């Protein structure tokens, strides 16, 4: 198997705002600093606040409770970079010798003394420690706004959102602490960006574009679900087509900001006359309710995203050992749990998008996943070409496998792949967060004049799968719908489950998991064997980009063929 050294996947220059930069910013903006104060390694003040696009509308009540997640920094980031270079280098004796959770902590996680210092700091400042772990590099805390302001030397202000009809809150300056070392990040200090699922309802899409629903797309004609819609099992038939591999022995995780009602999943299986045998766990990582009831949905159940994530993952890998939905209120709390939970999820799907105040926030965790042999698949979005307005993150992070969308046709119900074009709203393009181009996208033949990619910044997506309005869904404790929902939300869990098949085959051969797949698939796909393990999508467009031969910024390398399993697990 060919490969490429991960090397510059850890970019030398990113938009990092370390303590020195933040201290300078504090002086420029006239912020009072505290003697010997430690700034964070990441930003916490939104650009619209920093540049005075918005002005304070008020201040959070001093007694209002806040739940935060303190993230400690990596102990040896340079050493981790070198380790990742080795572990993804096929010529190295360390190739795919991944670390266990305790091994990672001992080499690269916070020391016990530093972790204890943060816990002591939190308690001494009036917070209750509610969760987190040294292995997870985080301390979950809860306390009143007054404690937040005093401990981190900020004022928690409210502002009119510049693009949404609501008030948001956030700190007026970069937080500091009295600790002897800088923290990495504190999640939960603002609610400027509310995470949203990467799915689209056809009727809403039609209304937004001033057209009839039937003008959006024709109904699926070759699915085995109601009204010929596609089921998760149809995607397995199209992209895998075999029976030997089911994901047996593998643990898959789903990244979720809301809970679900498993009755919706049971209704789906009852209606399509199938049975699910995979044990499902709804895991609250920080006390967030696992219920599907959402205040943003008027107190109603809202679990379309969560249910479709399960049906696509279970459809592709029906024999998984476990499927765990990691449910939380902050991104760091969710992903921290995903890097420490037993059994460890070695392949993960994320169908949510949001705009972090600092795109480097999750880097320590994504790097940790790569070191532990985990894969993180993120939906690339449903708003066409990436921009600052349509929230590409986390799909444009360089340690994430970005999954775009296609329009799939099969030869028959539950039949094999027949044809595929680019989905017209597939997210992709050049990183709006200006994340540096990783080493595997620098390979000769990846970026060219046909695909119009960047030679400076990260390009996406990496891969793709069906995302058109051709699926069958059951959700929200109400009804089941055929050919109504689409989005890259469907494609990300499909890919996560497909890699569970790869990991199963590797396990039968006594091998470790495949780990982060991008270095391998890029190096493989610039060779003549590309067409044997990927469906190269060469027609259709989305926004500024078109599907072309080879890699493109609409569908990436395309959708998987069964032969890809043998390429990754020879």
Task: Show where each model-derived region lies.
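N-terminal secretory signal peptides that target proteins for export/translocation
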Residues: 1-17
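Bacterial N-terminal signal peptides
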Residues: 21-30
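Polar, glycine-rich mid-to-C-terminal structural blocks
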Residues: 402-436
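Sec/Tat signal peptide C-region and signal peptidase I cleavage site
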Residues: 31-37
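Walker A/P-loop NTP-binding active-site region of P-loop NTPases
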Residues: 498
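Substrate-binding/charge-relay-adjacent region of secreted/lumenal peptidase catalytic domains
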Residues: 38-134, 140, 145-405, 431-487, ...
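An often Trp-containing, charged/polar helix-loop segment at the C-terminal end
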Residues: 450-451, 502-553, 561
